[in-house]
Amino acid sequence: TALVGRPEMPPLWSFGTWMSRITYFSEAEGRDVARKLRENKIPSDVIHFDTGWFGVDWQCDYAFAADRFDNPRQMLTDLRSQGFRTCLWQLPYFTPKNKFFPELVERGLYVRNGKGQLPYEDVVLDFTNPETVQWYQEKLGNLIEMGVGAIKVDFGEGAPLDAIYANGRSGLYEHNL
């Protein structure tokens, strides 16, 4: 708690049963899982969409794949009316093929190595940079506003140990905070 403070108590529903797998690839799959859970009276509180909710699997773009999610806002509303919260997976890495890669590089919102460059091919978001935090909050804010109940923040442990963060600290210090 000395580093990051005490967390607030999570909402009660977050302690319930989560239905997840790698991955539900469509609105139809998510709705089908929810329907079967309720039909079979299986207590559950969260439907989690892992890597496949993006247009390209594992390519975090903070948008539901339009060809597989006809109306994500309505899906979220409908799932909520059935007693489900919805969780979405994401990761803080952006490959050169990701649509946000050029913007993140241009704006300098990434962790650097000792030479001030990308530590490896992907951009890793630098959450010690207030501009990065604002960018990230805007992306997630759109999803929360739509009705998403939780975000699975994955792969923080992969941050480069030899990186230099905007706050001047090394990756060894910032690793997995």
PLM region descriptions:
Residues 1-45, 76-78, 85-86:
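Carbohydrate-recognition beta-sandwich/jelly-roll modules
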Residues 43-177:
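Aromatic- and carboxylate-enriched substrate-binding clefts and catalytic-loop regions
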